[in-house]
From Swiss-Prot:
Biotechnology and industry use: Secalonic acids show unprecedented anticancer activities against various human cancer cells and might be interesting for further derivatization, targeting diseases such as cancer.
EC annotation from Swiss-Prot or TrEMBL: 2.1.1.-
Protein name: Methyltransferase AacuQ
Cited InterPro entries: Diverse_substrate_MTase (IPR051052), Methyltransf_11 (IPR013216), SAM-dependent_MTases_sf (IPR029063)
A matching Pfam family: Methyltransf_11
Entry superkingdom: Eukaryota
Pathway the protein takes part in: Secondary metabolite biosynthesis
Gene designation per UniProt: AacuQ
Region (Methyltransferase domain): 57-149
Length: 309
């Protein structure tokens, strides 16, 4: 496989380089993936002949899922683009069965070819150069190894009034991000990949077995809410392959009940809200709708599972 230079994405790289306070709120404001999520990944991996030696948790942030991976694998490599996030992960998890590296998903020269049993990429692949990232992931995986990609995080609220304000908060935050982005075109592509069905991961048929699974959970109401403003035009390729198997499932374990404070924790788990000058006005609208009422909703999610040839 050819070696390529990984572009520096400037402000995009720094979106989740936010420090300990942000990550503490992130852990409260984002969904806790149910046991069924990880069981699906582990069952797929085992049924396709995968081993449970080394898993590489790429774009891991501060490693919120690394301890679950460690419960099945002998060794977990935790990588993130932000060095501070890696330090936070090591402070919490220690070194028994864990190793750490600060690097992009596209960078892996320090990892031996064919040495990884699973690459676990959750809530990160939309940031990447798609062909470069998938080429590097394939290089690391041993034959029969699993590429496990997932995205979840944006809520889908039952009350359409709450969902409307939430969507407008996302779009307003997206405009604020684009206004200060070093490369707005790249950031638009990132936002577009996140939206709806989570459009990532081109799977080279020479590197991955056919019939990869692209599983859409709880997307009956439109999929994942993203910060891409509706007035922005984007032309991103569709990365689902002709031999990929797409399924749409309503799955238990992804619903939530919370209140106004829980909604605020969730909104502030995204890095654009605090810096958006319109956030205060939009949040006041949210407060007026919710008041002291309970808020119900669901977490849409996307899972991609593929096996290395």
């Amino acid at each position: 496989m050819a070696t390529a230079t990984v572009p520096f994405f400037d402000s995009n790289d720094r979106l989740f380089d936010q420090g300990k306070a942000f990550w503490n709120n992130y852990l409260k404001g984002r969904p806790s993936a149910p046991d069924a999520f990880f069981q699906r990944l582990f069952n797929y991996h085992q049924s396709h002949g995968g081993q449970f030696g080394t898993v590489h948790d790429v774009g891991a942030g501060n490693g919120p899922y690394a301890h679950i991976l460690r419960s099945k694998f002998q060794h977990v490599i935790i990588s993130d683009i932000a060095k501070e996030n890696v330090v936070l992960a090591e402070d919490r998890l220690g070194v028994d069965g864990f190793s750490y590296r600060a690097a992009r998903v596209e960078e892996g020269d320090d990892i031996a070819p064919g040495s990884v049993d699973m690459v676990f990429a959750t809530n990160v692949l939309h940031f990447c150069d798609q062909p470069l990232a998938m080429s590097e992931i394939a290089r690391q995986l041993r034959p029969g190894g699993t590429f496990a990609c997932a995205a979840f995080g944006a809520a889908q609220f039952e009350d359409p009034r709450i969902q409307d304000v939430y969507t407008r908060i996302n779009h307003s935050g997206g405009r604020a991000l684009l206004a200060k982005a070093d490369d707005p075109e790249k950031l638009v592509a990132v936002m577009a990949r996140t939206q709806g069905k989570y459009n990532v991961a081109p799977l080279d048929e020479g590197l991955f077995r056919p019939r990869a699974q692209r599983i859409h959970l709880n997307m009956e109401n439109g999929g994942i809410t993203a910060p891409l403003p509706p007035e922005v035009q984007v032309h991103e390729p569709v990365y689902t392959g002709v031999d990929d198997v797409e399924t749409f499932v309503q799955e238990d374990g992804w619903s939530f009940v919370t209140g106004l404070e829980g909604v605020k924790e969730h909104v502030l788990s995204f890095p654009f809200a605090r810096d958006d000058p319109n956030f205060g006005e939009l949040w006041q609208e949210m407060e007026e709708i919710i008041g002291d009422d309970e808020v119900k909703g669901t977490w849409p999610a996307k899972i991609i599972l593929a096996t290395r040839r």
